[in-house]
From Swiss-Prot:
GO cellular component, one term: endoplasmic reticulum lumen
Subunit structure as annotated in this protein's UniProt entry: Interacts with BIP1.
KW Signal (keyword) present: yes
Keywords: Chaperone, Endoplasmic reticulum, Repeat, Signal, TPR repeat
Domain J: residue ranges: 357-423
InterPro entries found in the cross-reference section: DnaJ_domain, DnaJ_domain_CS, J_dom_sf, TPR-like_helical_dom_sf, TPR_rpt
Subcellular compartments: Endoplasmic reticulum lumen
Chain positions of TPR repeats: 36-69, 70-103, 116-150, 152-184, 185-218, 231-264, 269-302, 304-336
One Pfam family named in its UniProt record: DnaJ
Protein name: DnaJ protein P58IPK homolog A
Stored PANTHER family: DNAJ HOMOLOG SUBFAMILY C MEMBER 7 (PTHR45188:SF2), DNAJ PROTEIN P58IPK HOMOLOG (PTHR45188)
Length: 476
């Protein structure tokens, strides 16, 4: 090692950048060109290059040879302050003031040191209180101003940025740290987490793995790595089961995946969508709506989630909601014929929901036979004949009109088939009031012919009083 003292400076300098041990410099200083003044000068050059570790080693070497070198104490204090080794820096400033009392500039530097030290302590306190914005204020505005090479502050800053979900900046900040020290485990962990929360799982995994190669028992790296591995495995199981048609198992897998990390929104958006699709296929519309809504809360531009929620609303017979979602999806993706087809179905169902339910008016099921339809019509026509309801004639006329219109459609097999298919019929009153609906008591309009074998008995109302059996009457 003594031979090292004979090495030229161009060879020695790179080694100085890597070592700060006083022992190293004891050997180095034996060279004829490595006297304290030369080492001190080179230390200042290193400081100007922001090579603080190298300059610290040189200053240590100076003070080994010349313990009362006041400027070496001052400059070493400055380097230590830069690296936020505040207690050591304070000792060096105090030593300088012993050697040269009354230096206002050094007293100012000491004051800045104490200010940075207090700010770093406050930043840690704010981090524990989860006030991450204040953490950044203390670090950026004070600590890193006076201690620009403070690794603790840089790591705390990265943690605060991670908590604030500023993942891109975390990647940038930890990148600077790893450029100086590629094996920094804290930086590898933080950078891996940032990539993880950006859903770049492959890159995240590589960071975790590198850290674990350096320290296989690092608890946080192990937790992050195996947590990611389990998440990917469970997600794949959900997707595989969905592809195989094992929909109930797939739904449970998706739910289990979502429970692993509720804060992983950039990834969970796809899990919510996958779950929604499976629930739609299972016919569980209400649950599907909830899952797709969660996806849209994360990414409101996710067309697939809008489409699937529209399909889910069709299952719950929320026709208007389905049309709204599918129309928005169609606007965002106008070339998608699948969305257009779904929108047409939703619009048809909405239209059908607003038309008259002739079966309900006659009080019969949709599977009623022609004979049952006729019997129901006869019964209701007698019940609501206006001449039999003089005290509530207006209500009776309205009901009789509805009954007549219902029978006009359901009593005709062709019209009934078309009605059941959801087709529009000009002859039908599709509901909503107004227009050319059937009105047997008004002038003009449509003409309906009713055949009734039993006859209306009793007088009043219509011309001729009661009607004999086998009669025919027209409303024009």
């Amino acid at each position: 090692m003594v031979a090292m003292a004979r090495w030229p400076w161009r060879v020695l300098l790179p080694l100085l950048l890597l070592h700060s041990s006083p022992v190293f410099f004891v050997f180095a200083q034996e060279g004829q060109d490595n006297d304290p003044s030369t080492l001190f000068k080179r230390a200042l050059e290193m400081m100007n290059l922001r090579k603080y570790d190298g300059s610290l080693g040189l200053l240590n070497a100076v003070l080994e040879v010349e313990p009362n070198h006041s400027e070496a104490y001052r400059q070493r204090a400055s380097v230590l302050r830069h690296k936020c080794r505040y207690k050591e820096a304070e000792g060096d400033y105090s030593k300088y003031l012993e050697l040269k009392p009354g230096s206002s500039s050094v007293e100012k530097e000491l004051s800045q040191l104490l200010q940075a030290q207090n700010a770093l302590e406050s930043a840690y306190g704010q981090f524990e209180s989860h006030d991450f914005s204040k953490v950044l204020d203390y670090i950026n505005k004070i600590v890193l101003v006076f201690s620009p090479d403070c690794l603790k502050a840089k790591l705390l800053k990265a943690k605060a940025l991670l908590a604030l979900k500023d993942y891109s900046t975390v990647i940038s900040e930890t990148g600077f740290i790893l450029k100086e020290d590629e094996d920094n485990l804290d930086a590898l962990l933080l950078r891996g987490r940032a990539y993880y929360y950006l859903a770049d799982h492959d890159v995240a995994s590589r960071h975790y793995q590198k850290g674990l190669r350096l320290d296989p028992e690092h608890s946080e790296l192990k937790k992050a790595y195996f947590g990611l591995k389990n998440l990917v495995k469970k997600t794949k199981s959900a997707e595989d089961n969905a592809a195989k048609g094992k929909l109930r198992v797939s739904a449970e897998d998706y739910k289990a995946s979502l429970a692993m990390d509720p804060d992983h929104t950039s990834y969970n958006v796809h899990l919510y969508l996958g779950l929604c699709k499976v629930l739609v296929k299972l016919g569980r519309g209400k649950e599907a709506i909830s899952s797709c809504t969660e996806a849209l809360n994360i990414d409101g531009e996710l067309v697939d989630a809008l489409t699937q929620r529209g399909e889910a609303k069709l299952l719950t017979e929320d026709w208007e909601g389905a049309v709204q979602d599918l129309k928005e999806a169609a606007q965002k993706s106008p070339q998608d014929m699948g969305i257009r087809e779904a929108l047409m179905r939703a619009e048809k169902q909405l239209k059908l929901s607003k038309r008259k339910d002739w079966y309900k008016i006659l009080g019969i099921s949709k599977t009623a036979s022609a004979a049952e339809i006729k019997r129901a019509y006869k019964k209701l026509a007698l019940q609501w004949h206006p001449d039999k309801n003089v005290d509530k004639r207006e209500e009776a006329e309205n009901m009789f009109r509805e009954i007549a219109a219902a029978y006009e459609v359901l009593g005709d097999e062709d019209k009934r088939v078309r009605y059941d298919r959801g087709e529009d019929l000009d002859e039908m009153n599709m509901g909503g009031g107004g227009g050319g609906g059937f009105n047997p008591f008004g002038g003009g309009g449509q003409q309906y012919t009713f055949h009734y074998d039993g006859g209306f008995h009793g007088g009043g109302g219509f011309p001729g009083g009661g009607f004999p059996g086998g009669f025919q009457f027209n409303f024009g």
